[in-house]
Regions:
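Metal-dependent nuclease catalytic regions and adjoining charged, substrate-binding loops involved
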Residues: 5, 110, 114, 121-214
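A non-catalytic, helix-rich entry segment at domain boundaries
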Residues: 1-58, 62
Length: 214
């Protein structure tokens, strides 16, 4: 792996490239915080990272249950043909835990991150150019929790999970095809809108529809 300073240099370059998005004080705080967090993150995992990986992998041309899908994945870790999908997250992991829950009585559609994990498996498993098989999706939080610990949460996906999300994907696609859904209802707690937004389906499928129309 590259040395730690190269990672920090990349972070600094990116921050300066987007300097206009911050006030002077916010930029300085973010630079200081990012430097500290990334150095500690590097030290935590440098000796355990999988070296057989693909990063920022675009997957296109997938058709699942008659629905065209595409996506960009942060990282794929390989053990032969078996894949662990890694999705990097920032923010407080404790606030994210409910989003990783499978469907239950209070949230029959499942959490946003849970749906994202299942969507990744559907996408990769049905990518005909490769014979990859997703065994898990891992959410890697680059910011420490309240105790200063860096944490990862891994989700394994069952056939029942895939069937649930398949039905959701199909429903979204049918509504888009009927020009019945574009921007959503605007309610922040709407399961429907959150599913589309967090799995990039609205953008992906809308873009595809425009391409077909052209």
């Amino acid at each position: 792996f590259p040395p730690k300073e190269e990672m920090i240099s990349d972070f600094n370059w990116y921050m300066h490239r987007h300097r206009e998005n911050f006030t002077k004080e916010a930029f300085e705080r973010r630079m200081e915080y990012g430097d500290e967090v990334l150095r500690n993150y590097y030290d935590k995992y440098i000796n355990s990272w999988n070296k057989v990986v693909a990063v920022e992998r675009n997957i296109r041309g997938v058709v699942y249950n008659g629905v065209p899908l595409k996506g960009k994945l942060d990282k794929l870790e390989f053990n032969g043909k078996e894949v662990n999908v890694v999705d990097y997250k920032s923010g407080n992991i404790d606030n994210a835990i409910p989003k990783m829950k499978a469907p239950h009585e209070k949230d029959p559609n499942g959490g946003d991150y849970w749906r994202q994990a299942v969507f990744y498996k559907i996408l990769v498993d049905n990518y005909e150019q490769k014979e990859w098989k997703v065994i898990s999706t891992e959410f890697d939080f680059i910011e420490p929790d309240k105790k200063g610990e860096y944490r990862k949460e891994k989700i394994t996906i069952s056939p029942e999970d895939m069937e649930t999300v398949k039905q959701q994907i199909t429903e979204v696609w049918n509504r888009i095809q009927a020009r019945d859904f574009y921007t959503g209802c605007g309610k922040p707690d709407c399961h429907w809108c959150n599913f589309v937004k967090n799995n990039n389906l609205a953008v992906t499928l809308h873009d595809l529809e425009e391409e077909i129309a052209d």
